Amino acid sequence: MEKSAIRMIAQMISLNRIEVLFLKQYYGGYSPKFYLRDMSNNSLKEIKIADKYEDDRFIHYYFNEIEIDFCRVYQIVDAYGLSETLQYSKLVYDEDFLNMNYYDGDDLGNNYHMEYTEFKVWTPTALEVKVLITKNDTTCSSNMKRLDKGVFYAKIEGDYDNCRYVYLVRHHDEYCFTVDPYAYSSSSNSQSSIIINLDKT
């Protein structure tokens, strides 16, 4: 979205605190109420404004003690019906969030079996992750499930030895392709990761 078109930005800035930037040119930067929408069940609840301040362009609204399940996607809705996806990206600067999502497991990456392959990637600020596997020039996409500690997981049935894969990661309303930082091997151009049968090595 172009900056000129942005009317509202919604972001978690700590574990239980939300910041909403409301464009002054949109209703004078004023909304008497805001709501939190849980996209898993479309439920809507009002959240109370704790404090606010303004800069040259935006009114900044703050909301405290907001309980968020990071396995879900949320929207902030203003009093006029405008909705905006709640971003988690700024939580990389929050020590409490990073401590809560600290993961020291040794099972990240791909784990090959002849009948299936498991995928695990640590990306705690992502809203959604898909794994895209290419076999015989055909690419299939599968949603990954968010587990504890910011780990996303998928188990894909079938034999995918030596197949290429990438992750499609969603932050806010944008998606980006990324290789697996925990993979044992990657393609020659480093554009994709490779599933490896370690029993052959």
Stretches found by the model and what they are:
Residues R37-M39, V77, W122, L132-T134, ...:
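A generic structural motif
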Residues W122-A126, N136, L147:
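A short, compositionally biased micro-patch
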Residues P32-I68:
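Acidic, low-complexity Ser/Thr/Gly/Pro-rich repeat segments typical of extracellular/periplasmic
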Residues F22-S31, W122-V129, Y160:
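Short proline/glycine-enriched turn/loop motifs at strand-loop junctions of beta-rich domains
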Residues E2-I13, Q25-M39:
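Short, basic/aromatic recognition patches that contact phosphate-bearing ligands
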Residues E2-A10, Y53-E118, T139-S141, L147-T201:
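The feature marks proteins involved in alpha-glucan
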Residues Y27-S43, E128-T134, T139:
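Short, surface-exposed alpha-helix to beta-strand junction/turn motifs within ectodomains of secreted
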Residues N16-V20, E115-F119:
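Structural beta-strand segments of beta-rich domains
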